[in-house]
A protein has these predicted regions:
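Negatively charged, low-complexity tracts enriched in Asp/Glu with abundant Ser/Thr
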Residues: 1-32, 52-71, 79-80
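Short, conserved beta-strand/beta-arch hydrophobic-aromatic motifs that form part
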Residues: 35-53
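Divalent cation-coordinating acidic motifs and surrounding scaffolds
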Residues: 75
Length: 80
């Protein structure tokens, strides 16, 4: 199971999300306050992730410690 910390965050808050895994890369999609968000992992050797959690209309790439960085962004959201 990939993106375990982010999945646990959603489960603890009882927030619905979709998760799937392909080629050792996890993907999460979810809706929050009417907007659609994604977290998509990149495969080795350039392990990282792409997500729009910082700004819903713009995707950005996260490198080292991507799961921790994305999780910290999610924790700043109100009403989560």
């Amino acid at each position: 199971m990939r993106l375990a910390g982010i999945q646990q965050f959603f489960k603890e808050r009882r927030l619905p999300f979709q998760y799937w895994e392909d080629d050792d890369c996890g993907s999460i999609e979810f809706d929050h306050r009417g907007l659609h968000y994604h977290i998509w992992e990149f495969p080795e050797p350039e392990r990282g992730a792409q997500s729009n959690v910082r700004i819903a209309g713009r995707s950005e790439e996260f490198g080292d410690n991507y799961e921790e960085v994305i999780l910290e962004i999610l924790k700043t959201w109100e009403e989560f």
